[in-house]
């Protein structure tokens, strides 16, 4: 081999080794250069992610992501990291991650195999399950008992997928958790199938006009969304989440949002972490059991 060509190859190899490990990750490079992290949140997914007093983004997932951001800032040795919040709907959340309008989504997204074809996920921070919200005087307890009923679902949600498996139902698409609960309360739908935690919050909020019934129809690991093309950023998120779990910070944040009165709501959900989440807090890792229809 010509000596000049050998020297050129050697120089190229050395230069490649000298590149920083995050150079191929455009998301992380943008965060470092701009000093800004754009977070997507939901307007009405209490207690996980919702607009609080004055429209301020609040909730369990939002506060966890704020802690993540602080640790990412420290890890990257940034003098400051400005957080910019963008409201996103269930229908558009994956597109907003894909087009870079948001770099992290902190809400109620279920980690599934199909969705991992489009986006990547951080560690699980809550295990939800689809259940039914019905009017207070409705005696039906199971989706299989609904017959030809009108069932509200959010387009693109796992609640929609669960409901589509039940023959005979007329599915009524709604844009949000609040709209689904309102449709049931006003008689425009007979039931609303969605994440149990959001339904429990809506039942408390509506003070006896609606109720959550039946066992869970699924087991769904909820986690933050990141771009599937941002492996370095995803690794940072996962490591920061492990630290939050191991030092007890995540458990304290959970207590604030699930076991104490909700800010601006005046009631507590009184929901201690279940066995799955307790195990995740104790032994955090990136393994996830794909969501299951029961």
Model region roles, listed by residue range:
Residues 25-105, 117:
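Extracytoplasmic small-molecule ligand-binding "clamshell" domains
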Residues 43, 126-134, 200-242, 260-283:
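Periplasmic-binding protein-like
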């Amino acid at each position: 081999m010509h000596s000049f060509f050998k020297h050129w190859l050697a120089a190229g190899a050395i230069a490649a080794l000298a590149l920083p490990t995050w150079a191929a990750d455009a998301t992380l490079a943008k965060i470092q250069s701009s000093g800004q992290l754009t977070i997507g949140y939901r307007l009405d997914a209490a207690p996980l992610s919702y607009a609080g007093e004055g429209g301020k983004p609040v909730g369990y997932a939002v506060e966890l992501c704020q802690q993540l951001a602080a640790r990412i800032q420290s890890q990257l040795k940034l003098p400051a990291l400005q957080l910019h919040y963008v409201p996103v709907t269930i229908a558009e959340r994956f597109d907003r991650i894909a087009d870079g309008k948001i770099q992290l989504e902190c809400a109620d997204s279920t980690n599934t195999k199909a969705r991992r074809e489009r986006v990547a996920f951080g560690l699980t921070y809550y295990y939800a399950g689809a259940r039914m919200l019905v009017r207070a005087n409705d005696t039906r307890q199971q989706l299989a008992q609904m017959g030809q009923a009108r069932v509200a679902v959010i387009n693109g949600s796992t609640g929609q997928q669960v409901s589509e498996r039940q023959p005979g139902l007329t599915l009524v698409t709604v844009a949000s958790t609040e709209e689904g609960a309102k449709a049931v309360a006003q008689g425009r739908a007979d039931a609303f199938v969605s994440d149990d935690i959001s339904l429990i919050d809506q039942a408390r909020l509506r003070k006896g006009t609606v109720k959550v019934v039946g066992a869970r129809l699924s087991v769904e690991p909820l986690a933050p969304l990141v771009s599937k093309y941002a492996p370095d950023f995803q690794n940072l998120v996962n490591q920061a989440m492990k630290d939050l779990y191991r030092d007890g910070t995540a458990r304290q944040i959970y207590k604030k949002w699930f076991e104490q009165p909700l800010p601006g709501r005046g009631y507590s959900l009184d929901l201690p972490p279940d066995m799955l989440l307790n195990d995740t807090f104790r032994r955090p890792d990136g393994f996830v059991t794909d969501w299951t229809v029961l």
